[in-house]
């Protein structure tokens, strides 16, 4: 039996019109060895790389479905970590643009990502209150840190010590010892959410930003350094009073004697506060890579910059203060007052951290990033609330630095939501109009070819001939634009209220408008003499007016131009004859006003979409309701028939576009992609393209393919997608022996881990079958007294006729490192005995010892009770113990030998070139110089 009706599938073709999404952060990235030229910005589910110099998009890092919420470039500049709304993390290569590594561990949106100094570990914080530390090289999770009670806002690795500091919306700042994976210190000095934190002054100072205008500064003292007698106290400044020294000594004494359990690694003391100019909360707080410039901003459009002075600069400042104080003392003594035996000068926080300047952007700041150019110039790039990227530069070394805007990316999108879309008659040009501008896009290249300023646009269409466009505005005006010149030809006051809808007449000689002033007006095109030119230009003139009792929300002509449908605020749709304007039909049944409607190409059907979430299909001959469809989970915002068919599209506030069959009342397909409310859509005259706009600032193009769509298969795919979503939402299986404390298992059950577990189970089943077949084959050969050919398995032949045990090993090697533990966790215990026997075989052969040991130790940990109580497995475990120890020792010896060889080669190279070209050598030298200077200062202070 053939298909009764064939539908063709529409697929997502492109995302355009968005420069940067609001949920994520902007970061500088290094491409082709150039720093400070390229930025990565989140763009819905993708990441766009923009060239700030040319204002061009040069690379798109393709996402899947979820919106991007966080970006973090790796220290080597080769990779970019991207966090998503569903809690997944992908690491993209900036050279190829491919995302090869995926981490799944969080249940909610990623809020912060930070690499450690070498780029080997990545810390991720989420709205699910957990922090997970990932091993980037091994592509797996290391441990989960639990302790915060609300979303994580920031996480930072310390350079010198294996510690992590995190802040959250629970008002806490927590310090984690990564050797033991537990929280050893919680700072409770904040009364509101902590929105950001930075480490300064060689990680001896912490600055936190909360919901007030205060930046709190904390001094960090590490216990080892306090106990080190060679280290002088950095707080003792030349010229400081004995009283201050006594206080510091008393504090030091407190460090040693009255040591609280949480102060065993470090101690935090509040040093003071820096007052911001902004009164609202801190949105972002950051420091540049040199550690000299501190920047923060609130919910407004001002970035505040502070300079962290070096020790030399502070000393210079203190010397000046001292000189001034001595002069003052001399002046007092000359006036006959008693001279102080010693002049006291105290160093305040304002002496160390100085305000530099403020950068005022053109709109509210969503995020920013800082970078120092080789010429000493500071560059600050901003992602603004109105879909805009701006770059400012300034020289912080000048006495009064003036920020200068050097670059701006604007042409690729509107500043506000697009409220109306239209296709040209040849399907090539797309018009989009928002609150302040109209843009004309080339559909094939997605480039903006014309931008024109306008008032708040609500509806639009291309004038026949595609040389002019007409816009209806919120103030009730009609605006006529010429596309060739980009000029506004004419503005006409059409309605007293908002002009909600327009419909071009089928004979293309005029159009009709409906407004909030309860009237429908008819207009004709005409040519009038242009004052500035000898040629005539297009204009419009009003011919008739239809006055109604309610506000008009939508108007639509029937294709034969005999009828006019008018949607009113009283939830009805009234049909009038066009020639006499007499009333013909009233379509009532919607519970809320009809926002959108369209009439089919043959004039037989009218479909209406309402704020009550329903779409109703009516016959235009008698006004009977053929069917009422529950179309969306929120208001239906737009509805349009596909030309020359009874299929139509609807767009809703539930972020979805749906296609329907008005004859069979079937839901054909759902186009998902937008992340927020969809305002409007337009179907091209050919029906091959659909373009839609949303509150997420993006415009999306959907294309009709030649692929037939079968409804039963579509429903099956939807059910599968629902099941996959439900798998991710299931509770994590309990791991025996694991405590739900600070540190916990990092994985998350996903459909990929379930599939990986199924592959392992299938491989074990095949191994069992093949082993049984081989036993049978041996018995047959023995009975026959000759060698009988062994039947070969097609799966093993596909892998190159390998043995069943080698096939199992291949399956284990094929599982992603980040999904390995979770796959083993969902594996039933009945497969574990066979796996353990195979592991013993693999380790004896020396095959992938590291991988097999990782799987073995995890299985032993989660099935400890069942394995130890099973007498059959005792000899297997005993053998595993012997083979594992010997083989792991061999692997360790090989690594040790390789490291010794590399050390030898390093020494050889150094001896030849007589240059210490490894970074640790220079850092050791700098450390020695620093200690020597501190000792000299201490001697000066004591003398």
Curated annotation (Swiss-Prot):
GO terms for molecular function: RNA binding; snoRNA binding. The keyword Ubl conjugation applies. Ubiquitous. The modification Phosphoserine is found at residues 240-241, 726. SUPFAM superfamilies: Nucleoporin domain (SSF117289), WD40 repeat-like (SSF50978). There is a cross-link at residues 474, 529 (Glycyl lysine isopeptide (Lys-Gly) (interchain with G-Cter in SUMO2)). GO terms for cellular component: nuclear membrane; nucleolus; nucleoplasm; Pwp2p-containing subcomplex of 90S preribosome; small-subunit processome. InterPro entries: G-protein_beta_WD-40_rep (IPR020472), SSU_processome_Utp12 (IPR007148), TBC1_cilium_biogenesis (IPR051570), WD40/YVTN_repeat-like_dom_sf (IPR015943), WD40_repeat_CS (IPR019775), WD40_repeat_dom_sf (IPR036322), WD40_rpt (IPR001680). Part of the small subunit (SSU) processome, first precursor of the small eukaryotic ribosomal subunit. During the assembly of the SSU processome in the nucleolus, many ribosome biogenesis factors, an RNA chaperone and ribosomal proteins associate with the nascent pre-rRNA and work in concert to generate RNA folding, modifications, rearrangements and cleavage as well as targeted degradation of pre-ribosomal RNA by the RNA exosome. PANTHER family: WD REPEAT CONTAINING PROTEIN 3 WDR3, WD REPEAT-CONTAINING PROTEIN 3. Part of the small subunit (SSU) processome, composed of more than 70 proteins and the RNA chaperone small nucleolar RNA (snoRNA) U3. This is WD repeat-containing protein 3. It comes from Homo sapiens. The gene is WDR3.
